[in-house]
């Protein structure tokens, strides 16, 4: 098959991928929420009888005054905790800047008049201290400012003395180098009656339109995991259509925002209910409810969960739950994207530059495919040499396609030519290209990652469109280097001539890292073509 047709095949596959991707985002079937039977109903409070505070009906007209909040500073973030309920209402990620050259940290959780994104946890049940009807507990704290400083761990205890004389302590534990927080309710039942409580954790997020595009789609919404479903996205539209109500052992819930995630992870051996809701005011809510605990008089009980707020760091997420790293969603080619990501990290650890690491991946891929590439050009050269015989067959058999096809197969067999031999390298390159596309799109490590000169962020488009234009020029050179069959259809010739322009336009808005991969791949292909064609000419093949 002619190389020109291969390039057309690339274009069709590429455009089909983009269209399929957009269709998935807009038209994919909504998942059906079904209650799982892995947990006996008696072990977990009924979803409809729970007293979890609902998502607020609207954004608050005013937010809690900053002087009332408890500020916790570690080496990774600055968190603010509201003493009313002990909710985490603000998180500034110190290692991740809002703007590449700016000083302001990236803020994930925040409670403002425009954006409402908080992590809430509490105790419900007969003796719970948080309720949608009676309100939240007002905790006391020894200080309004806590700093990890030179410590490896930092504990922030909040205390609440209930009317029955029972002391509830909500203990936050922070760790150096980590984005996760332990939230531990310690209940000392000094009363004469048995207590019954249940922990919940939920994430509330105001629904706003995603800023992604067809070329760089990003997901903003919820996700969850159960014993039967390791990972499932649950978009805001899904949440509006139907509330979740799933019983499971362990599990987790999360809110995703491109490179960042917030997640509640209850103990893996606990029996929980995963739930969701959307308020009339536009607040999406996803959370978990744990098992009911009976606390006898004179005893103490600890009920805990972990909360993560930070980048989609696969290693850190896996440490919390073996499936939480799946929030780094590489799509249907995840099995190929994972080794590509590992190789990218490996190269970067040596060279210290993500752009150079992408170049090394390109050289690795092209090197691995070189035997197939050589076979491709050899097959195409043989096919070109067969064109006169194929033209003669067309004249002899006319419109008799059956005889024509049979004669062609006999000719291919006699000349030892595989008419599909030129397609294999193309078909192998496309999955690699798509997998790398998702790696560059999903990997937080490439956010604000510079290359050289004007390319200061490989995760966004080239600001001056230099690389996409160079890529188009390289495609044009490749096209000119490849002999064009005289029998080629005129319409196909026209399409071929426009293909570099079409690709250039497509790549104008692609991440610079992906354009770099394709550009370097083209330059390597041009070099390989010259070497292969020189060898073919010595064998009398042109």
Curated annotation (Swiss-Prot):
<dbReference type="GO" id="GO:0015031">
    <property type="term" value="P:protein transport"/>
</dbReference>
<feature type="transmembrane region" description="Helical">
    <location>
        <begin position="350"/>
        <end position="370"/>
    </location>
</feature>
<protein>
    <recommendedName>
        <fullName>Membrane protein insertase YidC</fullName>
    </recommendedName>
</protein>
<dbReference type="InterPro" id="IPR047196">
    <property type="entry name" value="YidC_ALB_C"/>
</dbReference>
<keyword id="KW-1133">Transmembrane helix</keyword>
<comment type="subunit">
    <text>Interacts with the Sec translocase complex via SecD. Specifically interacts with transmembrane segments of nascent integral membrane proteins during membrane integration.</text>
</comment>
<feature type="compositionally biased region" description="Polar residues">
    <location>
        <begin position="32"/>
        <end position="41"/>
    </location>
</feature>
<keyword id="KW-1003">Cell membrane</keyword>
<dbReference type="GO" id="GO:0051205">
    <property type="term" value="P:protein insertion into membrane"/>
</dbReference>
<comment type="function">
    <text>Required for the insertion and/or proper folding and/or complex formation of integral membrane proteins into the membrane. Involved in integration of membrane proteins that insert both dependently and independently of the Sec translocase complex, as well as at least some lipoproteins. Aids folding of multispanning membrane proteins.</text>
</comment>
<dbReference type="InterPro" id="IPR028053">
    <property type="entry name" value="Membr_insert_YidC_N"/>
</dbReference>
<dbReference type="GO" id="GO:0032977">
    <property type="term" value="F:membrane insertase activity"/>
</dbReference>
<keyword id="KW-0472">Membrane</keyword>
<feature type="transmembrane region" description="Helical">
    <location>
        <begin position="326"/>
        <end position="346"/>
    </location>
</feature>
<feature type="region of interest" description="Disordered">
    <location>
        <begin position="32"/>
        <end position="57"/>
    </location>
</feature>
<dbReference type="InterPro" id="IPR019998">
    <property type="entry name" value="Membr_insert_YidC"/>
</dbReference>
<keyword id="KW-0997">Cell inner membrane</keyword>
<keyword id="KW-0143">Chaperone</keyword>
<dbReference type="InterPro" id="IPR038221">
    <property type="entry name" value="YidC_periplasmic_sf"/>
</dbReference>
<comment type="similarity">
    <text>Belongs to the OXA1/ALB3/YidC family. Type 1 subfamily.</text>
</comment>
<feature type="transmembrane region" description="Helical">
    <location>
        <begin position="458"/>
        <end position="478"/>
    </location>
</feature>
<dbReference type="InterPro" id="IPR001708">
    <property type="entry name" value="YidC/ALB3/OXA1/COX18"/>
</dbReference>
<feature type="transmembrane region" description="Helical">
    <location>
        <begin position="6"/>
        <end position="26"/>
    </location>
</feature>
<keyword id="KW-0813">Transport</keyword>
<keyword id="KW-0653">Protein transport</keyword>
<dbReference type="InterPro" id="IPR028055">
    <property type="entry name" value="YidC/Oxa/ALB_C"/>
</dbReference>
<dbReference type="Pfam" id="PF02096">
    <property type="entry name" value="60KD_IMP"/>
</dbReference>
<feature type="transmembrane region" description="Helical">
    <location>
        <begin position="501"/>
        <end position="521"/>
    </location>
</feature>
<dbReference type="Pfam" id="PF14849">
    <property type="entry name" value="YidC_periplas"/>
</dbReference>
<feature type="transmembrane region" description="Helical">
    <location>
        <begin position="421"/>
        <end position="441"/>
    </location>
</feature>
<dbReference type="GO" id="GO:0005886">
    <property type="term" value="C:plasma membrane"/>
</dbReference>
<keyword id="KW-0812">Transmembrane</keyword>
């Amino acid at each position: 098959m002619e190389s020109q047709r291969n390039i057309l095949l690339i274009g069709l596959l590429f455009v089909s991928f983009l269209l399929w991707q957009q269709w998935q985002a807009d038209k994919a079937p909504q998942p059906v929420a079904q209650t799982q039977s892995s947990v006996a109903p008696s072990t977990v409070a009924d979803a409809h009888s729970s007293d979890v505070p609902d998502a607020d009906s609207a954004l608050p007209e005013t937010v809690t005054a900053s002087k009332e909040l408890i500020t916790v500073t570690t080496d990774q973030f600055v968190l603010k905790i509201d003493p009313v309920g002990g909710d985490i209402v603000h998180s500034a990620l110190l290692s991740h800047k809002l703007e590449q050259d700016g000083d302001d940290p990236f803020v994930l959780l925040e409670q403002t008049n425009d954006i409402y994104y908080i992590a809430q946890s509490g105790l419900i049940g007969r003796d719970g201290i948080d309720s949608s009807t009676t309100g939240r507990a007002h905790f006391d704290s020894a200080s309004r400012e806590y700093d990890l400083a030179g410590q490896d761990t930092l504990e922030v205890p909040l205390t609440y003395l209930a009317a029955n004389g029972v002391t509830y302590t909500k203990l936050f534990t922070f760790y150096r180098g980590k984005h996760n927080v332990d939230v531990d309710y310690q209940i000392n039942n000094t009363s004469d009656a048995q207590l019954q409580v249940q922990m919940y954790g939920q994430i509330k997020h105001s629904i706003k339109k995603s800023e992604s595009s067809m070329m760089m789609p990003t997901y903003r919404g919820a996700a969850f995991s159960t014993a039967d479903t390791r990972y499932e996205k649950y978009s805001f539209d899904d949440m509006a259509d139907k509330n979740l109500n799933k019983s499971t052992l362990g599990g987790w819930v999360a809110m995703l925002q491109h490179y960042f995630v917030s997640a509640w992870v209850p103990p893996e051996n606990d029996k929980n209910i995963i739930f969701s809701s959307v308020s009339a005011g536009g607040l999406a809510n996803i959370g978990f409810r744990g098992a009911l605990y009976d606390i006898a008089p004179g005893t103490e009980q600890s009920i805990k969960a972990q909360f993560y707020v930070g980048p989609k760091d696969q290693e850190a997420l896996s440490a919390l739950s073996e499936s939480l790293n799946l929030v780094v969603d590489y799509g249907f080619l995840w099995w190929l994207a994972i080794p590509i990501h590992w190789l990218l990290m490996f190269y970067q650890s040596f060279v210290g530059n993500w752009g150079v690491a992408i170049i090394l991946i390109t050289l690795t891929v092209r090197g691995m495919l070189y035997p197939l590439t050589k076979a491709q050009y050899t097959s195409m050269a043989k096919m070109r040499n067969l064109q006169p015989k194929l033209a003669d067959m067309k004249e002899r058999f006319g419109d008799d396609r059956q005889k024509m096809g049979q004669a062609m197969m006999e000719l291919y067999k006699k000349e030892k030519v595989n008419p599909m031999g030129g397609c294999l390298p193309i078909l192998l390159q496309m999955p690699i290209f798509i997998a790398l596309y998702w790696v560059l799109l999903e990997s937080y490590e490439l956010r604000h990652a510079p290359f050289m000169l004007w390319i200061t962020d490989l995760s966004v488009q080239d600001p001056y469109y230099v690389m996409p234009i160079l890529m188009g020029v390289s495609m044009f050179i490749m096209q000119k280097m490849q002999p064009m069959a005289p029998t080629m259809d005129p319409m196909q010739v026209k399409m071929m001539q426009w293909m570099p322009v079409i690709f250039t336009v497509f790549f104008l808005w692609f991440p610079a890292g992906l354009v770099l991969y394709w550009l370097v791949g083209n330059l390597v292909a041009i070099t390989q073509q010259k070497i292969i064609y020189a060898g073919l000419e010595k064998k009398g093949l042109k």
